[in-house]
Each structure stands twice: as structure tokens, then as C-alpha cells.
Amino acid sequence: MSRAAVAIALLGCVVAAYGAPAEGHDDAKAEWTGKSWMGKWESTDRIENFDAFISALGLPLEQYGGNHKTFHKIWKEGDHYHHQISVPDKNYKNDVNFKLNEEGTTQHNNTEIKYKYTEDGGNLKAEVHVPSRNKVIHDEYKVNGDELEKTYKVGDVTAKRWYKKSSSS
């Protein structure tokens, strides 16, 4: 798997970099409420230990460290959810389609990626297995009011990033 693909994934949701775009998405059918983590989120300047997280993945800091404006959109459509991530300054946008508690598998550059979203105590969690890198990445999305705190973990390294509710599309 390319370093660029891994880095783009880490800037938002690791899973999103490997998911396929939503087929036939209809904004009129999108549900934006019902779970605290659903909605539109925009990254703030608050970030902790992200460079250490990038290093733990074996990626070069000069290329992938730092703070890039990132947007998350999480909504429900029918019996499944979408998690769309965009990083405008990297020209990146992707959408992963998932059902809670069900494993998804996809391919990226001929590499198998397995992921699973769950909900625990009202928080959204994503676990991503990247066998070719021998890595398991854990993401957790916790909401306090209009703020979402995302925790990234790989091995014994933890990083955090904060997002605010956004009205932008």
C-alpha cells in the first residue's frame, strides 16, 4: 500500500480511504439526526500527538505531519450509514458505506483491508486491519455538545483531534 494512501486515510478516517464511493446517494433520503456523532463536522486547530501517530505508522513527518483542514459527514440512509471524509488541500474526498457491527472488506492497491464500525456508550468506533502493514488502527468519535473528539490509536500511540459542528455541505 502506498504511503500517500495511508497518509490521506489518517488525515480523516482510516476506513474512508479504502471504501468505495456511495452508489446512488440521495441527499433527500439522508438522515442527519438520531446519533450524536451523525452530522457535518469541521476540524479545528486543536490536535494532540498526531506527529507521533504518523511516525508509529512509519510515514515521513515532513510529508504527512501537521494539521490539514478535514471534514467529516456521517449520515444514515435506509439501514446503512455513510462516512464521508474530505481533505480539500489534498484534493481528497471519499465515502464509506457501513452497517454497525458488520465487518466490511475492500481492496486498495491489491491490499485487503478489513474494517468494522461499532457503537459503544453512544460513541462511534472504527477498527481497521491493514494486514500488509501489520497494523490495527482504532478510531473513536466522542461528542460533547457541538464538539467531536476523534481519538486515533495504533499500537501504544494515541493521538486526538477535535471537530466542531458545521453547517457547510
Curated annotation (Swiss-Prot):
Function summary: Secreted heat soluble protein acting as a molecular shield in water-deficient condition. Tardigrade-specific intrinsically disordered proteins (TDPs) are essential for desiccation tolerance by forming non-crystalline amorphous solids upon desiccation, and this vitrified state mirrors their protective capabilities.
InterPro entries, alphabetized: Calycin (IPR012674), Fatty_acid-bd (IPR000463)
Entry's localization field: Secreted
Gene3D superfamilies in alphabetical order: 2.40.128.20
Glycosylation sites per record: 109
Region SAHS-c1, residue ranges: 31-60
Alphabetical keyword list: Glycoprotein, Secreted, Signal, Stress response
Signal keyword on record: yes
Protein name (Swiss-Prot/TrEMBL): Secretory-abundant heat soluble protein 1
Annotated spans, SAHS-c3: 116-165
Cleavable signal peptide: 1-19
Record-level GO cellular component terms: extracellular region
Keyword Zinc found: no
Start and end residues of each stretch annotated as SAHS-c2: 75-103
Domain remark text: SAHS-c1, SAHS-c2 and SAHS-c3 are 3 highly conserved regions within the SAHS protein family.
